[in-house]
Amino acid sequence: MTNARQIALELLNRVRASESYINLLLPKELAKHEISDADRGLVQELSYGVLRWQLQYDAIIDHLTPGKTLSPGLRAAIQLGLHQLFRMRVPTHAAINETVDLVKRFETSAAGLSNAVLRNAERAGHENLLALLTEGQDDLTRLSIEYSHPKWIISGMKSALELDGRSSDLSELLSANNQTPVVNLIAITSAAAVELEALGLERGTASPNGFLCIGNPLEYLSIPGVRVQDQGSQLVALAMSKVSDKAGTWLDMCSGPGGKAAVLEHAVSESGNLVCYEPHVKRAKLVTSALRDPESTSVLVKRGQDAPESTFAAILLDAPCAGLGSLRRKPESRWTKTPEQLPSLTKLQAELIDAAVLALEPGGMLMYATCSPLVIETNAQIRAALDRHANMSLVDLVPVLQELSPGLELNTTRKTVQLWPHKDGTDAMFMALLKKDEGN
């Protein structure tokens, strides 16, 4: 029988070989095996945990194996062992012996090496190893090892925090990125909220429509109007719904996989219409399946930056981005994303903004959002857009969010909104609201 550690190793190898998302691969992999709920939890903790702490574990492995080249599979297996030793309540003998047995299955000659590395790591102790690895290092290198983030991401987060008046929060943010997030549900309708409350679910702290999931989220998705959605994403759609003309036609410009579209659909259901663009066929199908009444909403397989077929009273541009705001849920992103990808992303974001401005009716609202706090994708992008489009103005979004969620600690000196996992318990969503002049 395949055990939990072997499944976790296979998952890690697949994620790294194909640059896939662990949250997509994990359910499919678990469905192939008949294992207990406890082992399912073990697979999840091992795979997510190692992906989060990969850089730190690699630094420890390299320190304990100077001059040696390890195969990817062997390195992954030792990472699993280190995670059990240092961050799980697994007995030392079990963490080491199970790892050695795992290595014997695919690289017998390396069993002794894996045993030696783990025993030396256990003898040295986690804190002592970190002290050795960070001694004499600059702050950026120290933070990179301590919190297992690439240096370029730490620098980007630092700049974003400084702009938001939170320059002292860097360590707290990096730590939050390594925490396991609570699964959040959204009750799109009041009837759905009543059902979730009757089941004993607690309200979320950030979104007025949010609930904290208990157990398997699939158990709640049969309730009409209930979706799995981070509270930050909920607030994007709810804020747009609050400020836009509900009698008009709205556009969700980059709508896949459909979570925000479902919220917008409900907002315009009485007197307006919703159109959804999504360039990828599979994701467009996900949008359709997320809608309550797909026949009343046009889901078009279309690129947002292409010439619009009509004009809209309100547009949501949830732009493609580096995705660094969701590192809690997608830990592998810190290793698959690179700074070299940013120029093409920011170019696409600018093209999408320009297309959205063209497609807006006079007086129309454009909600720009990213699941990334990087300044180049957020405030810098908005400043550049306002420079290009004299007929657009920035609307103060802070009062809108404060009315939706009075408990949020927002920076009231700026008109845009940046959410943070360590402060708000959400993904690091950015939002900006722009309005087109009435005469243009």
Q: What kind of region is each of these model predictions?
A:
Residues 1-440:
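S-adenosylmethionine
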